[in-house]
């Protein structure tokens, strides 16, 4: 009887400790701009409990890019993953900084209906693009410019890449710009793969982790824990392809063969260091100035702060 009572008390004590650890978790709201895999480290960190292990109760809220940036500025959320668009907002005075970069190149594919055979055939046609004149729009224009077709197309917002994919399937759009997994699915379904932006556009830090300057100053430890969780998620995905493929299969309800292709695609554009140099940031500032035809006075330190990420990288032996 005594042994049974002691065991019962032990189980009760462990349960109370577990409940206490749950209640101690700090709420954090992160807004990816798409349900797709452009921000896969965030989705993976949530599903595989990397945030929870850092004492964070992460709420992942998919928001259109412009909505997410506005919500971040007003304090409704803590982070957005729309790195490129947030950088554009920062050069216009928004108090935002990128603190982690996951993609040095945008994994954006322009896919078309089967009767369109090359980029030049897009002249005079509509192209569906996710977001609302954010980074994806400018990347599509830059890729089209490479083929001399940027002046004669009409870019139309599809809201997000999932909507773009369904618009292509339903025949509502001659062409759309898609990220994985939708780009891979569309290719396998026979839609024309016209161009991959990463093949013709230089470094473009489209996706990462962005927060406000105020949070960087006032909540450095919380930012550190979010960065730790994301770095762990990235390292997990790189070291365990089979596990990551299973995650993609579950998350997007796709066959293993397709998930394998999706994995390879996202690894090709992953920024392995998760950091950017001042030179790389300046390249993006120069691109923004050229695309918007404005003079930009913002410095690299005004739009990015990788100090904490560098510290965590050293901690992980990166």
Question: Where are each of the predicted segments found?
Answer:
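N-terminal secretory signal peptides that target proteins for export/translocation
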Residues: 1-5
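Bacterial N-terminal signal peptides
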Residues: 7-20
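Short, glycine-/small- and polar/acidic-enriched structural segments
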Residues: 24-170, 174-180, 193-203
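Periplasmic-binding protein-like
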Residues: 32, 102-112, 189-219, 223, ...
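Pocket-lining segment of extracytoplasmic ligand-binding domains
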Residues: 84-85, 162-252
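Ligand-binding clefts/hinges and TM-proximal coupling segments of bilobed small-molecule sensing domains
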Residues: 135-151, 229-261, 301-304, 308, ...
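Secondary-structure end/capping motifs
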Residues: 218-296
């Amino acid at each position: 009887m005594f042994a049974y009572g002691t065991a019962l008390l032990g189980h009760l004590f462990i349960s109370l400790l577990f409940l206490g650890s749950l209640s101690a978790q700090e709420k954090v709201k992160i807004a990816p701009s798409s349900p797709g895999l452009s921000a896969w480290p965030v989705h993976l960190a949530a599903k595989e409990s990397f945030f929870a292990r850092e004492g964070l109760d992460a709420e992942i809220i998919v928001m259109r890019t412009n909505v997410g940036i506005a919500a971040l500025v007003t304090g409704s959320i803590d982070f957005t993953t729309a790195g490129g668009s947030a950088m554009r907002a920062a050069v216009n005075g928004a108090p935002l900084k990128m603190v982690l970069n996951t993609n040095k190149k945008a994994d954006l594919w322009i896919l078309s209906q089967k009767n369109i055979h090359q980029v030049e055939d897009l002249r005079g046609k509509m192209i569906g693009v996710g977001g609302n004149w954010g980074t994806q729009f400018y990347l599509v224009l830059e890729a089209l410019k490479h083929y001399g077709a940027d002046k004669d197309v009409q870019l139309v917002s599809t809201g997000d890449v999932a909507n773009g994919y369904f618009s292509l399937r339903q025949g509502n759009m001659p062409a759309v710009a898609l990220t994985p997994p939708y780009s891979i699915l569309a290719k396998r379904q026979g839609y024309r793969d016209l161009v991959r932006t990463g093949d013709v556009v230089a470094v473009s830090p489209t996706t990462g982790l962005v927060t406000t300057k105020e949070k960087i100053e006032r909540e450095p430890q919380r930012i550190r824990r979010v960065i730790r969780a994301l770095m762990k998620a990235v390292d997990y995905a790189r070291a365990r392809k089979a596990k990551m493929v299973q995650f993609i299969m579950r998350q997007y309800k796709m066959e293993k063969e397709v998930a394998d292709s999706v994995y390879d695609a996202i690894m090709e554009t992953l920024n392995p260091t998760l950091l950017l140099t001042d030179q790389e940031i300046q390249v993006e500032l120069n691109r923004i100035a050229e695309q918007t035809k404005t003079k930009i006075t913002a410095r690299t330190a005004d739009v990015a702060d990788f100090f904490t990420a560098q510290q965590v990288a050293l901690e992980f032996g990166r």
